[in-house]
C-alpha cells in the first residue's frame, strides 16, 4: 500500500474525527463479509479480551491507535491499527514485555507479562453479555449546562480543545471556528480528551450542534443539507446575539 503524506495539524495530529480532505470516499459494496481475512476476527477478539483486563479505557485505546507514526497510520489497514495500538498498551501497562512480544513466549520468571493473569479466556456467552452491557459514558451532572437549545455557539479548533498537545479529541477539524446552533442536550458524559490521557473522567455536558453543510464546505453552495455533531461543552464558546 502506498504511503500518503498529509499535512498535519500544528500539534502533529494525523488522525482526525472527520477524516482528511481529498476524497472521494469509497462506498463499501453491499453484502461484503464482516472480516476480509480470518486474522481480522482474531484481532477483534484479542483486543476485546485484553480490554476486559480493565487496565485502560476505551478512550485510551483509541488514542493508542491515533499516536502511531504518521506513515504507519496511513499505511496500516483498520485492524492493523488495532493490533499496533494494542501492542503499545500491553507494553505500557506492563502486561507484556517487548521481548515477549517479539518471541510470542511468556517470560520464564513470570514476574511480568500475561503470566500473572488467569489464562482461562471468557466464553462466547460472557463476551456477548459484556458487549450487550456496553460501557455507558453518562455521568451525574456536576454543574448546570452552559448552553441552551437554540443558542448559537462557535467551535474551537481541535488543537485548542485537546487537553494535551496533539492529544485525543472527538472534535473534527472541519468544524473548527464554525458557528452552529444547539439543538439538544445529552446530559454529562465522560470527556474523552481527558480520559484518554489518564487525567480522569472529568464529565462535561454534551450537546447536539447543527451546522449548515455549505458553511462547513463552501463548495456545497446552495445545499440545504445540515450536519449535526455531538460536541462537549469545552469545545464550544457562546456567540453574542
Model-identified regions with their sequence ranges:
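N-terminal intrinsically disordered, low-complexity, charge/repeat-rich segments that act as generic
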Residues: 1-117
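Basic/aromatic-rich interaction segments and small domains that mediate binding to polyanionic partners
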Residues: 14-47, 89-90, 131, 137-149, ...
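Short, basic/aromatic beta-hairpin or loop at an interaction surface
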Residues: 117-134
Amino acid at each position: 500500500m502506498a504511503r500518503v503524506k498529509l499535512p498535519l495539524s500544528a500539534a502533529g495530529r494525523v488522525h482526525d474525527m472527520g477524516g482528511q480532505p481529498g476524497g472521494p470516499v469509497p462506498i463499501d459494496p453491499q453484502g461484503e463479509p464482516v472480516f476480509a481475512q480470518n486474522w481480522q476476527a482474531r484481532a477483534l477478539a484479542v483486543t476485546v479480551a485484553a480490554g476486559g483486563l480493565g487496565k485502560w479505557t476505551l478512550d485510551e485505546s483509541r488514542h493508542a491507535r491515533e499516536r502511531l507514526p504518521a506513515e504507519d497510520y496511513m499505511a496500516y489497514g483498520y485492524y492493523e491499527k488495532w493490533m499496533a495500538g494494542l501492542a503499545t498498551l500491553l507494553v505500557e501497562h506492563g502486561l507484556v514485555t517487548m521481548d515477549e512480544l517479539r518471541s510470542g513466549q511468556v517470560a520464564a520468571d513470570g514476574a511480568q507479562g500475561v503470566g500473572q493473569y488467569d489464562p482461562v479466556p471468557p466464553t462466547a456467552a460472557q463476551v456477548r453479555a459484556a458487549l450487550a452491557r456496553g460501557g455507558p459514558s453518562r455521568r451525574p451532572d456536576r454543574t448546570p449546562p452552559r448552553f441552551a437549545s437554540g443558542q448559537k455557539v462557535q467551535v474551537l479548533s481541535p488543537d485548542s480543545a485537546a487537553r494535551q498537545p496533539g492529544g485525543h479529541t472527538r472534535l473534527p477539524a472541519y468544524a473548527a471556528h464554525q458557528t452552529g446552533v444547539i439543538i439538544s442536550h445529552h446530559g454529562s458524559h465522560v470527556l474523552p480528551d481527558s480520559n484518554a490521557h489518564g487525567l480522569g473522567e472529568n464529565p462535561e455536558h454534551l450537546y447536539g450542534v447543527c451546522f449548515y453543510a455549505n458553511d462547513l464546505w463552501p463548495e456545497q453552495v446552495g445545499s440545504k443539507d445540515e450536519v449535526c455533531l455531538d460536541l462537549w461543552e469545552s469545545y464550544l464558546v457562546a456567540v453574542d446575539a
